[in-house]
């Protein structure tokens, strides 16, 4: 399995590389915000079209709420699986996208998005990672894991 993980965490799998906090511009075809089941399946669909994907997620691992909140809970509405747990679903999706070599940026949150002069998008994370892509997919899931407090004095 060849997954490349960029993270602000010290828990890295496979290739130990870090970009967080370094001022570099990564270029790819698609940036997917969210590495839950929808984000992972998006990698598969885009991979079939030979598109390179980078995923941004605030969590330190793929799977979103399925893996983080209820990894052992049975899920009954996934096609071709009468019953599957949240972690099993995540594991199957990771296995399915392996041939497309997605790049994960864990422990980072999308902070800004702007259009460049050449018409592509530049996404910057809260840790300063910048990724230039033709397309941005928002697969942020059912809710944020980081509470946003209102600016009350």
Task: Give residue spans per PLM region.
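FAD-binding core/adjacent interface of flavoenzyme oxidoreductases
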Residues: 3-6, 14-16, 21-31, 48-49, ...
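Generic structural signal for well-ordered secondary structure
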Residues: 59, 71, 90, 138-139
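Glycine-rich FAD pyrophosphate-binding loop
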Residues: 48-67
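N-terminal Rossmann-like FAD-binding beta1-loop-alpha1 element of flavoenzymes
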Residues: 28-54
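Gly/Ser/Thr-rich beta-alpha loop segments that engage phosphate groups in nucleotides
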Residues: 36-41, 65-66, 143-145
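N-terminal Rossmann-like dinucleotide/flavin-binding domain of flavoprotein oxidoreductases
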Residues: 67-130
């Amino acid at each position: 399995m060849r997954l490349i993980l960029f993270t602000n965490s010290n828990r890295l799998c496979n290739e130990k590389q870090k970009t967080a906090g370094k001022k570099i511009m990564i270029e790819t075809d698609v940036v997917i915000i969210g590495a839950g089941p929808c984000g992972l399946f998006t990698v598969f669909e885009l991979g079939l079209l030979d598109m390179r994907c980078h995923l941004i997620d605030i969590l330190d691992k793929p799977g979103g709420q399925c893996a983080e909140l209820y990894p052992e809970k049975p899920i009954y509405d996934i096609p071709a699986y009468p019953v599957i747990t949240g972690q099993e679903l995540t594991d199957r999706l990771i296995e399915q996208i392996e041939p497309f070599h997605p790049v994960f940026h864990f422990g980072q949150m999308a902070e800004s998005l702007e259009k460049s002069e050449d018409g592509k998008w530049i996404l910057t994370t809260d840790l300063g990672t910048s990724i230039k892509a033709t397309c941005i997919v928002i697969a942020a899931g059912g809710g944020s894991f980081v509470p946003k407090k209102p600016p009350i004095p």
